[in-house]
C-alpha cells in the first residue's frame, strides 16, 4: 500500500501546477541547446579557420622549407644532447632518493620499535 501511495503522490506532484515552471524551463533549455552548441562550434572553428587561412597564404615550398628547418633543429638538439651525462645524473638522483627514503623508513621503524618494545634490540 505504501508503494501505491508513493506512486500516487509522485504522480500528483509531477502534475502539480507549481512544477509547470520547472517543466517550462527544461523545455526552453532543450530548445536553446542546439543554438548554444552551434555558437560554440562556430567559435571553435573560427579559431581553427584563422589558422587555416594563415597557412593558406603560404606557398607549399615555404611550408616544406619550414618543415625541413624544424626537422634539422630537432636533429641538432638530439645530437647536442649528452645522454650519457643525463643517465648518470638520473642514476645519482635515484640513488640519493633511495638512500633518503630507506633512512626515513629505518628511523620510523626504530621509533615504532622503541615505542612498542621499549627500545631497539640488537641480535
Swiss-Prot record:
Extent of Basic and acidic residues compositional bias: 50-60, 74-100, 107-123
GO biological process per UniProt: negative regulation of cell integrity MAPK cascade
GO cellular component, one term: mitochondrial outer membrane
Cell location: Mitochondrion
Major location (coarse): mitochondrion
Superkingdom assignment: Eukaryota
Stretches for region Disordered: 34-123
Keywords, ordered alphabetically: Mitochondrion
Protein name stated in the entry: Uncharacterized protein C4F10.17
Organism encoding this protein: Schizosaccharomyces pombe (strain 972 / ATCC 24843)
